[in-house]
């Protein structure tokens, strides 16, 4: 489990001091909960995020243990180091919005016919309770030929999950190479 500290002082000076000591600044929030300003060791946070098997993982901040989902993060444009992360508390029974990654499987037929596979959506917006949250959407592109596309409406959605993205939006497609 990832352990962090609660930041008492908020501001640029305090954040810079924590970053200098190897901490990652984080905000933790959720519906009906008070926001928590936290900090995690950067290397520990990266290890924990890489080894997790689900979108939801546990963190301990101060005396609280919370199940959270990574909502957003900021990286340094030059060094690509993590600078900041936003975490949303995944509460059981509370319907909330999440971003779920898309995994593509198979090799499209259109690639052999001088086509190019284009993935226009890497994450899809869904609305569901934390216990119904899928880890990813798996799309099989093996039947796609040049000019074909898989739309949001073509994705099989588990029970209790609602898609927020429009039905007509293309997720992945094969286009003719120029």
Curated annotation (Swiss-Prot):
GO terms for biological process: translation. SUPFAM superfamilies: Ribosomal protein L25-like. GO terms for cellular component: cytosolic large ribosomal subunit. The keyword Kinase does not apply. CDD domains: Ribosomal_L25_TL5_CTC (cd00495). The keyword Ribonucleoprotein applies. It holds the Pfam family Ribosomal_TL5_C. GO terms for molecular function: 5S rRNA binding; structural constituent of ribosome. InterPro entries: Rbsml_bL25/Gln-tRNA_synth_N, Ribosomal_bL25/Gln-tRNA_synth, Ribosomal_bL25_b-dom, Ribosomal_bL25_C, Ribosomal_bL25_long, Ribosomal_L25_dom, Ribosomal_uL5_bac-type. Disulfide bonds: none annotated. Keywords: Ribonucleoprotein, Ribosomal protein, RNA-binding, rRNA-binding. NCBIfam families: bL25_bact_ctc (TIGR00731), PRK05618.1-4 (NF004129). Part of the 50S ribosomal subunit; part of the 5S rRNA/L5/L18/L25 subcomplex. Contacts the 5S rRNA. Binds to the 5S rRNA independently of L5 and L18. Belongs to the bacterial ribosomal protein bL25 family. CTC subfamily. This is one of the proteins that binds to the 5S RNA in the ribosome where it forms part of the central protuberance. This is Large ribosomal subunit protein bL25. It comes from Campylobacter jejuni subsp. jejuni serotype O:2 (strain ATCC 700819 / NCTC 11168). The gene is rplY.
């Amino acid at each position: 489990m990832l352990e962090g500290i609660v930041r008492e002082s908020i501001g640029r000076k305090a954040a810079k001091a924590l970053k200098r000591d190897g901490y990652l600044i984080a905000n933790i929030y959720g519906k009906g909960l008070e926001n928590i300003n936290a900090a995690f060791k950067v290397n520990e946070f990266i290890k924990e995020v890489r080894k997790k098997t689900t979108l939801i993982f546990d963190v301990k901040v101060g005396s609280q243990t919370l199940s959270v989902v990574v909502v957003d993060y900021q990286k340094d444009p030059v060094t690509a180091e993590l600078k900041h992360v936003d975490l949303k508390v995944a509460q059981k029974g509370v319907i909330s919005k999440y971003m779920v990654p898309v995994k593509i499987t198979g090799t499209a037929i259109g690639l052999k016919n001088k086509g190019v596979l284009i993935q226009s959506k890497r994450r899809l917006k869904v609305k569901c309770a934390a216990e119904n949250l899928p880890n990813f959407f798996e799309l099989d592109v093996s039947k796609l030929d040049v000019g074909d596309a898989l739309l949001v409406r073509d994705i099989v959605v588990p029970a209790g999950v609602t898609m927020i993205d429009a039905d007509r939006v293309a997720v992945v497609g094969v286009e003719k190479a120029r």
